[in-house]
Amino acid sequence: MDNNPNINECIPYNCLSNPEVEVLGGERIETGYTPIDISLSLTQFLLSEFVPGAGFVLGLVDIIWEIFSVLSSDAFLVQIEQLINQRIEEFARNQAISRLEGLSNLYQIYAESFREWEADPTNPALREEMRIQFNDMNSALTTAIPLFAVQNYQVPLLSVYVTCNYIISSESVMCGQRSGFDAATINSRYNDLTRLIGNYTDHAVRWYNTGLERVWGPDSRDWIRYNQFRRELTLTVLDIVSLFPNYDSRTYPIRTVSQLTREIYTNPVLENFDGSFRGSAQGIEGSIRSPHLMDILNSITIYTDAHRGEYYWSGHQIMASPVGFSGPEFTFPLYGTMGNSAPQQRIVAQLGQGVYRTLSSTLYRRPFNIGINNQQLSVLDGTEFAYGTSSNLPSAVYRKSGTVDSLDEIPPQNNNVPPRQGFSHRLSHVSMFRSGFSNSSVSIIRAPMFSWIHRSAEFNNIIPSSQITQIPLTKSTNLGSGTSVVKGPGFTGGDILRRTSPGQISTLRVNITAPLSQRYRVRILYASTTNLQFHTSIDGRPINQGNFSATMSSGRNLQSGSLRTVGFTTPFNFSNGSSVFTLSAHVFNSGNEVYIDRIEFVPAEVTFEAEYDLERAQKAVNELFTSSNQIGLKTDVTDYHIDQVSNLVECLSDEFCLDEKKELSEKVKHAKRLSDERNLLQDPNFRGINRQLDRGWRRSTDITTQGGDDFFQENYVTLLGTLMGFPSIYIKKWWFEIKSLYPLPIRGYIEDSQDLEIYLIRYNAKHETVNVPGTVPYGRFQPQVPIGKCAHHSHHFSLDIDVGCTDLNEDLGVWVIFKIKTQDGHARLGNLEFLEEKPLVGEALARVKRAEKKWRDKREKLEWETNIVYKEAKESVDALFVNSQYDRLQADTNIAMIHAADKRVHSIREA
């Protein structure tokens, strides 16, 4: 069978008349490496290889390049166009293809630079080139993604939209700290990633549901298209979306294994089924199982009937076991009828890795001609069941093999090996749609309905020691009384459990392959309309108990933001290799809704970045204050430092520690208020420059003010040297705003500077020239600034001046000046503070008194000298005029006398 050259041809549209050439509006479109092939390959890679590290990254680069090749070839657009019968307008199509080609070219350049850097990761030039190409690629994708959500074309462009989102998410995982990006950039990208994952997910699910509703109709032909849309968009959209959360490397820092438990359905294996059965869509859909716990298909007992010499599959019974074979085998009710025209035949499904393929033979006859519907016989007269295995395990055959191949609808995930090894799904259940005369035991239609589950949903709940294991709770052995299985929201990879009253949720049989000494911690992915308490136990032994918050409002639909991952901090170990894990929900009022998607078992030795970040943030916040009651700030805590602690808190994971994050955020806001209260500057954030003549900041015209960025949360100023003067900004603090006999420091943060001069002036001038190497270049300036003897090795600066007695009559004040005196100078600074420290005492006080006396003596001498010069100048001016009104010159006044008087006036000193 595997030697057949046609077996590997995966035709995704078996409802089309010619599988080799698809015809859409007169246009010939060749099939080949289809979106389904790409998506299945991608899903396999993410499920089997998703672990941080170079191997994952390099494999991802290859897959992304293949994705771009298919995206830009129009295939993803054609796929959904055919399913929903909506052709994208030519301008929108051409625009999308053009953008995809541009992104493809950009990605090719980036991928090459990434490979070169990966081969020589210590080479700074290669790393910088890779970073440049990454930023270009990231910016282009970020800009392009909203353009693939075109109004009126959200559904046709859905696969393109989701796949591009996948690419940008994976790139954020690829390029982290080891690529040389600073912590602020990494945190910014992480925050963007976690936010965008939710946006992408909700967009994809919303428009998937919109498209699904659009293709629904009453007849069998409509159901075929409906089912194909559901199946193919599950493979190309929903499966990938369900794995988006694993990109959060702070929550999943090691290899993480997920499982897809949703089921998809091949079309009923009947001839002429897509066009002849009116009003049957609802009945066909009703033949599919409602949401249920996953079970393991053990066997199918098939019954045979005959009509006018034609033998066919008339009915069957299913034998199945719970996951992990953890309970007795159970039998489903009979599907169809128990025909006896031939001996019943039992197909054993649990050989190898289960049934991965069916090859069916259809039988179509029109033995009746009754009424306007022209009744027909449409049945199945044989099926071959092929087993997934690494060896040539013989197939099981009911009567005979056929040509209708399930792989045409659900291709393998790996086309580089035989389908029996590279298959993507296995048979999970068989139901039946039947229709016929009400007064006859012979049905017109006997249509077995094959259900398929992804191969990642393994038979046993295996928990190893070296990975995070995600187990959907639909793999439970038993449900607690009051727990039900409900349809999943589309982004969880399967159905979920629901409770509306306190009690046991479910029991889960798990098999431990690690030594029993291995310790684990449990996490739960849940949504709830109420605060509640989760309890866990193993083999009846209580393990964990914890209180958790509501995540959604009553009456709201489940969205990605409704689900939250929470965990217990206390580790535990299993006592037996095969154990029963029990989860319960308590301490909430009946009538609320609690949804549980999965349980995660995490090796206890794994240090989560989220936990480390929380501990670091808690320590940083507590160290801002002088005591645990947060009454006052420590003197050495700067305004800039508070902003950085705020960034630290902002980067905490909402899923892991939302309540702690809110509490820490309030403490940081309180610290910021205390910082503002002690700051004597009227305008520390440069919001009112040049607004008041007598107070506030004054600046020259070539100084700019910018808003917050990765370095400054609030406004900062930029000074650039020019040919036309020296840019400066200054402020004066008046006497009545300053306490006597206090040291007065000015401090702040300089992101980078060259030839920045800082002056602090009262009795005398404190002056410092500051060079601080920065990280971001200014246009023509190079990012590397040579560090000389006058360079600051810290971005923080502080100058202080001692304030003596403040005198109403003197109005001396304190001047703060920042200035650039060279053409190539520049500076970027913010978070300025003017503080009052402890009163001066002892020698410091005596030193200030001496400086103050020296300044007063000098001032008195200057005043005495100035008065003498003033009197002489006034006498010279008075002698020029005939009266004190200075409106008429003396008759003998000449130009020499006027120049002499002017010279004396200009010799007067300004006090």
From Swiss-Prot:
Function summary: Promotes colloidosmotic lysis by binding to the midgut epithelial cells of both dipteran and lepidopteran larvae.
Signal peptide: none
Keyword Zinc-finger in record: no
A biological-process GO annotation: symbiont-mediated killing of host cell
Entries under SUPFAM superfamilies matching the protein: delta-Endotoxin (insectocide), middle domain, delta-Endotoxin (insectocide), N-terminal domain, Galactose-binding domain-like
Stored Pfam families: Cry1Ac_D5, Endotoxin_C, Endotoxin_C2, Endotoxin_M, Endotoxin_N
Note: Toxic segment of the protein is located in the N-terminus.
InterPro entries given in the database record: Cry_V, Galactose-bd-like_sf, Pest_crys_Cry1Aa_dom-IV, Pest_crys_dom-III, Pest_crys_dom_I, Pest_crys_N_sf, Pest_cryst_cen_dom_sf, Pest_cryst_dom_II
Lineage of producing organism: Bacteria, Bacillati, Bacillota, Bacilli, Bacillales
Organism: Bacillus thuringiensis
Protein's name according to its UniProt entry: Pesticidal crystal protein Cry1Af
